[in-house]
Structure formats: C-alpha cells, structure tokens
Amino acid sequence: PRGKHPSIQTRYGSLFDLIEPHPGSVDIDDIALTCAREGRFGNRTKEHYSVAQHQVLAAILVWRRTHKHELALRAGTHDAHEAYIGDIMTPVLWALEWEAGPAVVSAMKTLKARLDKAILQRFNLEPLVAIHPGNEFISDADRQLLMWERTRFMEVPGGLWDIDEEAIYKLTAKDFGLAEDSPLLMALPAHNAHGLYWNMLRRLTRGWGLTGGLAEDADLSALPELNPILAMEMDLAFKIEVAS
C-alpha cells in the first residue's frame, strides 16, 4: 500500500482525498462543472449529453413523483461522485470482476459510498438506510432514464443489453411535465448543463430551506445562470400539479 492516501487535484487546484473524503473539501461548483463536461455512456452518445443533465432529469422525476425537496436533491446528486472518479460504466465493472473477481466491484462500491456520504454531508444530509423507500424512487428514475436516454441519444444497439428491458417503465415527456420538443429534453452542451445543474441545486435547496454548501461557497452571483428558455422549462418541470 501507498504511504499516504491517494488524492486527486480538483479543477480549482485543491487536493481531494479519495480514501477519507471530507465534506468541507467538496466544492459544489467543481461537481457541477465536471459533471456538465462528463458525458453519459462513456461519451458515446450522438451528441454531448452530460452526467449533470442526467441528474437534473432524475431530480425532476423524483420531485414529480414525491414532491419532496430532499429526495429530489438526493436524486440530483446520485452520480455526483463521478466528478471525482469518472463514469465507470457497468460493463467495465463486470469485465473487471471477470478478470479479478468480486473484490474489485466491492471496492468500487465502497469508494462510491464514501464519496456519496461526503457529498451529501456537504448539503447537511446523511445517506439513506438501505431499506428507506426513497432509495426505490431514485433507483427507478435512474433505470428508466437509462432506457429513455439510450433511445433518445444513442444509435440503435446492435444487440440486447444485459438488462430486463421489458420490466422497465417507458418514460415519455409527460413524466417530466414537459412537451416532447422541450429543449430541456434535448442533449445540452456543457455550458448549458452547468447552468442547469446550478438551477436545480438553487431550486431544491431554497425550497427545502436547506443551504448547506451553497451558503458557504463563493459569491453565488458569480456562478452560471440558466438561459431564460431553459429556466422556464425548469419552472414547468418542478411545478406542483393540483388535481381538479
């Protein structure tokens, strides 16, 4: 083993400890910008579609199904660890398990869990216990988005994926509270995804009365704003429908 913990340098120059990540070392804009630049599916989409936008859409789905700011924020940060370790695709993990055994996958789960905990604590949250029903809302949204994104942003697959596709609910634009041609459902370039992610964070932390890392970070006015059209679409997506 190494004499000291492995760490990585963030965009802003600080070193981030991967073994004992501290909530105070989590820079929220570093997550927002890095996830906006990180492409889903190993950047193999037809055009840039980011991890940041994926998380925003997950937050929208969970919000519309629960109307709980906290759960929606958890959905909106469920892949935030990828800002530090990248998007290690599931087939790659399976290949590593094939070559080196289950210890590799177990180690990756442990690493992700540590990072997730530090990121959540930056927002004054703690990880949910395994049996918490909120986990199911988040995992359902993640699986459903996987299939929706594949159809919308990738080429037609040359064979079946190793997933029970028939068991997964097929999303439509209505699930997001949006029209089919909404720009929010189009693949956005990194600079728009960066602003989109911050819009989600501001919206959910303000609505829940949670400040956490946002209040402690640099001047919020210097952070990216979302263009007005996308901001209006976010208003629609996060609107609470009142039954007549």
Model regions and ranges:
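Metal-dependent phosphohydrolase cores
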Residues: 1-244
